[in-house]
Amino acid sequence: MNNMFGNMRAYGSLKLSLFIVCILCLKPFGSRAQANEGSPWYVSCELSSKYVWRGLEYGKSPTLFPSINYESGSFLAALSGAYAVDGSHQEVDLGLSYTIKDMVTLGLNDYFFPSAVGQNDSYFRLRHSDTGHNVEASATFAPTKLPMWLKLSCYVYGADKDSTGKQAYSTYAELGYQYVFKNEDKLSLALGANLNKGFYTDYERGANVVNIMLKYESWFTFNKFRLPVSASYVLNPYRNKSYFTFSVYFSTK
């Protein structure tokens, strides 16, 4: 019985991956009217001095984040990756999100971390017992009329296992505030915490603050061209760590 349910969950994870790929492949063959309005496709890339996510450090060097995106109305699908320039971290992600009434965004993401030697990886190993994937469901409340957001996310399937080998359901909550200046620069402050014994605290501690972030977003201006940049100070009280990162952004959108 357990094997049957495990196979069903693995099949569900595979369907998510194939569904995202199919969307990205088939959508261009839509109506001519939509094509005349401009392509819903765009490519984006971020170059960051260090990969820090939710108070956790990934890799030891500057990291490149390329992404292929499809956006139509409130729907967004993305194929993205993360590659540290010294090879200390690799990541391949699939994501879907849908925003309801410019207020609530529901998301489903698949995170996969290839090893340093790619030939040893098995992307389609989807069994619950030994898969390298992590599937996360999330909900973000961010009304356009309020300069704040509240995010709740949970790892619902995959390699997120506790010390007993059971699914840990690592859960993260984040409350943030953003101030927009008259010149469109943005200053954000976020407070994030894990809500259970998950990977944010190495499956050893329950609720803890793991991410305090102060971020400033602006542009470098070259004649009429503006290059988006950001600087972030990140503090992880649980791990007694702090980081400062700088990022530049490129997009065809």
Regions from the PLM with identified roles:
Residues 34-85:
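Short glycine/proline- and aromatic-enriched beta-strand/turn motifs that initiate or cap beta-hairpins
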Residues 214, 218-220, 240-253:
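Outer-membrane beta-barrel "beta-signal"
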Residues 46-50, 80-84, 99, 109-113, ...:
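Outer-membrane beta-barrel pore domains and translocons
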Residues 74, 125-198:
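Detector for outer-membrane/organellar transmembrane beta-barrel domains
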